[in-house]
């Protein structure tokens, strides 16, 4: 996993409010980070954070009430040996959760070794789950794409096309028809799972839509809270193309896809021409995609129907054989 620039300080700053973290020792270790080789070998965030485990010393170590109870039952010699082995390998930081006070000798050892030590009143399991989700997000593959990203009938749809084709105007019309804006112009996509890509709006462009001749429109202010969305999973790409009959396939036999972060996303192409109601066409494309996801393929059904008709016609014209 890619965790360049992720330090104890950055993790603390991003999660202090949610986890109610307090930094009690090891302030000098603010730049402490994951071991590079360990981070590269990690297959998921579950490898990067967990309960106290000396077998995996390079991950974030979370100590709840059971771990602290176990630690306090150890002899002083065993405490020094086990914590010495752990801290020697420089974990990013330690978290004492469940509202338990860290043992004084553990706090002292963290101070002397510049190992960040945090405390949290939240349960250790919740701390681990939260940090795993956080690390999954910041380490996930991501890309910024140009277009208008909308929630249409509950489906994340990215409208793309050359400049001047009317993407923003189309987005505005769809919003006026009750659909929701996620992002305009720049959309940040992040792959959070094997078949899960989430799109969000950069904070600077939140709720804004740029329309030629009108300038910037604050969609949330104009249309209300229900006209904007924070995030959506991308399921469909609508590519607007200029009218060029020589290159446009009216009835594509094979589904078209666009690769986004290594995942094929279903794509439809719509020609832009005078008199065409693009908003209705996009809504129809979304409804058709919903049917395809349910296993209903209109084109395939038509081809099967046509094939059956041709076979029936061929059978009706076949020679009947002669009686001898």
Curated annotation (Swiss-Prot):
Q: Where is this region: Important for the catalytic mechanism of both phosphorylation and dephosphorylation?
A: 209-218
Q: Which residues form the active site?
A: 146, 167, 185, 250
Leading EC class: transferase
Quote the EC number.
2.7.11.-, 2.7.4.-
Identify the residues that bind Mg(2+): 168, 210
Cofactor dependency = Mg(2+)
User: Which molecular function GO terms apply here?
Assistant: ATP binding; magnesium ion binding; phosphorelay sensor kinase activity; protein serine/threonine kinase activity; protein serine/threonine/tyrosine kinase activity
Reaction equation(s) it catalyzes: [HPr protein]-L-serine + ATP = [HPr protein]-O-phospho-L-serine + ADP + H(+); [HPr protein]-O-phospho-L-serine + phosphate + H(+) = [HPr protein]-L-serine + diphosphate
The residues the record assigns to binding ATP are: 161-168
Q: Which GO terms describe its biological process?
A: regulation of carbohydrate metabolic process
Q: Tell me the keywords, alphabetical order.
A: ATP-binding, Kinase, Magnesium, Metal-binding, Multifunctional enzyme, Nucleotide-binding, Serine/threonine-protein kinase, Transferase
Top-rank lineage group of the source organism: Bacteria
Record has Magnesium as a keyword: yes
Region listing for Important for the catalytic mechanism of dephosphorylation, in residue ranges: 271-276
Q: What is known of its domains?
A: The Walker A ATP-binding motif also binds Pi and PPi.
Q: Which NCBIfam families match?
A: hpr-ser
Q: Which family does it belong to?
A: Belongs to the HPrK/P family.
Subunit field text:
Homohexamer.
Additional comment: Both phosphorylation and phosphorolysis are carried out by the same active site and suggest a common mechanism for both reactions.
Biological function:
Catalyzes the ATP- as well as the pyrophosphate-dependent phosphorylation of a specific serine residue in HPr, a phosphocarrier protein of the phosphoenolpyruvate-dependent sugar phosphotransferase system (PTS). HprK/P also catalyzes the pyrophosphate-producing, inorganic phosphate-dependent dephosphorylation (phosphorolysis) of seryl-phosphorylated HPr (P-Ser-HPr).
Official protein name in the record: HPr kinase/phosphorylase
Q: What species is this protein from?
A: Ralstonia nicotianae (strain ATCC BAA-1114 / GMI1000)
Lineage, please?
A: Bacteria, Pseudomonadati, Pseudomonadota, Betaproteobacteria, Burkholderiales
């Amino acid at each position: 996993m890619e965790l360049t620039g992720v330090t104890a300080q950055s993790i603390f700053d991003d999660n202090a409010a949610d986890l109610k973290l307090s930094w009690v020792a090891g302030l000098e270790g603010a730049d402490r980070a994951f071991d590079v080789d360990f981070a590269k070998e990690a297959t998921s965030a579950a490898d990067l954070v967990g309960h106290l485990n000396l077998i995996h010393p390079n991950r974030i170590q979370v100590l709840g009430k059971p771990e602290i109870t176990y630690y306090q039952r150890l002899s002083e010699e065993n405490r020094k040996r086990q914590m010495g082995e752990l801290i020697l390998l420089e974990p990013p930081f330690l978290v004492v959760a469940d509202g338990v006070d860290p043992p004084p000798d553990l706090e002292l050892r963290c101070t002397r070794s510049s190992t960040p030590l945090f405390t949290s009143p939240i349960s250790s399991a919740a701390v681990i789950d939260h940090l795993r989700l956080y690390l999954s997000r910041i380490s996930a593959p991501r890309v910024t794409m140009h277009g208008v990203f909308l929630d249409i009938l509950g489906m994340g749809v990215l409208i793309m096309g050359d400049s001047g084709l009317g993407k923003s105007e189309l987005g505005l019309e769809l919003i006026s028809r009750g659909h929701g804006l996620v992002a305009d112009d720049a959309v940040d996509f992040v792959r959070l799972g094997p078949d899960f890509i989430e799109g969000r709006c950069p904070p600077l462009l939140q709720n804004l839509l740029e329309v030629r001749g009108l300038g910037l429109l604050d969609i949330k202010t104009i249309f209300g809270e229900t006209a904007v969305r924070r995030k959506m999973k991308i399921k469909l790409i609508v590519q607007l193309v200029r009218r060029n009959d020589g290159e446009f396939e009216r009835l594509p036999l094979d589904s078209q896809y666009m690769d986004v972060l290594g995942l094929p996303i279903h794509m439809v192409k719509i020609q832009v021409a005078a008199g065409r109601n693009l908003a209705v066409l996009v809504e129809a494309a979304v409804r058709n995609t919903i049917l395809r996801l349910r296993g209903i393929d209109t084109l395939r059904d038509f081809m099967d129907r046509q094939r059956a008709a041709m076979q029936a016609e061929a059978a009706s014209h076949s020679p009947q054989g002669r009686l001898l």
